[in-house]
From Swiss-Prot:
Swiss-Prot/TrEMBL catalytic activity: pyridoxamine 5'-phosphate + O2 + H2O = pyridoxal 5'-phosphate + H2O2 + NH4(+); pyridoxine 5'-phosphate + O2 = pyridoxal 5'-phosphate + H2O2
Protein's name in the database: Pyridoxine/pyridoxamine 5'-phosphate oxidase
Family listed: Belongs to the pyridoxamine 5'-phosphate oxidase family.
Organism domain of life: Bacteria
SUPFAM superfamilies named among the record's database cross-references: FMN-binding split barrel
GO MF terms, alphabetically ordered: FMN binding; pyridoxamine phosphate oxidase activity
Subunit structure as annotated in this protein's UniProt entry: Homodimer.
GO aspect biological process, one term: pyridoxine biosynthetic process
This protein's UniProt keywords: Flavoprotein, FMN, Oxidoreductase, Pyridoxine biosynthesis
The protein's annotated pathway: Cofactor metabolism; pyridoxal 5'-phosphate salvage; pyridoxal 5'-phosphate from pyridoxamine 5'-phosphate: step 1/1; Cofactor metabolism; pyridoxal 5'-phosphate salvage; pyridoxal 5'-phosphate from pyridoxine 5'-phosphate: step 1/1
Length: 216
């Protein structure tokens, strides 16, 4: 185990704007503000988020995915429906997200209910992906054992030969999900671990939010 005395205690920080975010009255405008700042300060993938799900035994899984859209209906990402995450969401359509923007010393935690996006939404997003990524979606049997990298590249080449000309359609097993929040927590690092933390809560989508300030 790491020697605790070797870990430096934080006494200073750099952060985003100095506005008091704890005065925000609803979460989506605050998220938009923070996400806009993260787009300017993060070295890569400010839309990266940890996605937590549970399997049918209650054992949790977590992995990084990329948010591909958000509005007041929720946060959207895409993947294979047969993947581990897809199967777990089919069995238990609830999930948690975490955005961590280290450059701003901020994080946003989200908990909510999950619904599939429409075929029209999935088609529209898939059409924006680079062709090589589209081919990879056809070739990948996500979350299944893979013999070798070469075998994967062969599978991609086989699919590419079928779509030399024209558009690549969306695979039927590839789609997206929308997480509609019932909890959104905003956390901002402060010196000496005296952080600022607020949570917005509601019982269901469409209902008004209640804001609670939390001990750090």
């Amino acid at each position: 185990m790491t020697d605790p005395t070797s870990i430096k205690h934080q006494t200073t920080l750099t952060s985003g704007t100095s506005a008091d975010f704890t005065q925000a009255s609803e979460p989506f405008a605050l998220f938009a503000e923070w996400f806009s700042e993260a787009n300017k300060s993060e070295l890569n993938d400010p839309n990266a988020m940890a996605l937590a799900t549970v399997d049918d035994s209650g054992l949790p899984d977590v992995r990084m995915v990329l948010m591909k859209g958000y509005d007041e209906d929720g946060f959207v990402f895409y993947s294979h429906k047969a993947s581990q995450k897809g199967q777990e969401l089919a069995g238990n359509p609830k999930a948690a997200l975490l955005f961590h923007w280290k450059s701003l010393r901020r994080q946003v935690r989200i908990r909510g209910l999950v619904t599939p996006v429409t075929d029209e939404e999935a088609d529209a997003y898939f059409a924006t992906r680079p062709k090589q990524a589209q081919l990879g979606a056809w070739a990948s049997k996500q979350s299944q054992p893979l013999e070798s990298r070469f075998a994967f590249e062969q599978a991609i080449a086989k699919v590419a030969a079928q779509y030399i000309i024209g558009e690549v359609p969306r695979p039927p097993g590839w789609s997206g999900w929308r997480i509609t929040p019932v909890r959104m927590e905003f956390w901002h690092d402060r010196p000496f671990r005296l952080h600022d933390r607020i949570e917005f809560r509601r019982d269901a989508a469409g209902q008004p939010w209640t804001k609670v300030r939390m001990y750090p």
